[in-house]
Amino acid sequence: MNKENVITLDNPVKRGEQVIEQVTLMKPSAGTLRGVSLAAVANSEVDALIKVLPRMTAPMLTEQEVAALELPDLVALAGKVVGFLSPNSVQ
């Protein structure tokens, strides 16, 4: 997995006794984005991110965990998601 796709959370997610300090984002396929507007994802709309991030994170975050993320962590994840939408020639 590409180390550039690993985000270290400023405020780790606590899941029971487990603490998630890093999240790896996997490049989405068309199916990953089903049910959300591509424009909404590209614009980093929170509702769209809450829907798609659980489908592309390892360990898999739940929608509730994504909704509870601190803003700097959500922005860091959103930046990677938007980066995946750009063609390789633009990156």
UniProtKB/Swiss-Prot annotation:
<keyword id="KW-1245">Viral tail assembly</keyword>
<dbReference type="GO" id="GO:0075523">
    <property type="term" value="P:viral translational frameshifting"/>
</dbReference>
<comment type="function">
    <text>Promotes tail assembly by creating a scaffold for the tail tube proteins. Tail assembly proteins E and E' would wrap the linear tape measure protein to create a tail assembly scaffold.</text>
</comment>
<dbReference type="InterPro" id="IPR019289">
    <property type="entry name" value="Phage_tail_E/E"/>
</dbReference>
<keyword id="KW-0426">Late protein</keyword>
<comment type="similarity">
    <text>Belongs to the mulikevirus tail assembly protein family.</text>
</comment>
<keyword id="KW-1188">Viral release from host cell</keyword>
<protein>
    <recommendedName>
        <fullName>Tail assembly protein E</fullName>
    </recommendedName>
</protein>
<dbReference type="Pfam" id="PF10109">
    <property type="entry name" value="Phage_TAC_7"/>
</dbReference>
<dbReference type="GO" id="GO:0098003">
    <property type="term" value="P:viral tail assembly"/>
</dbReference>
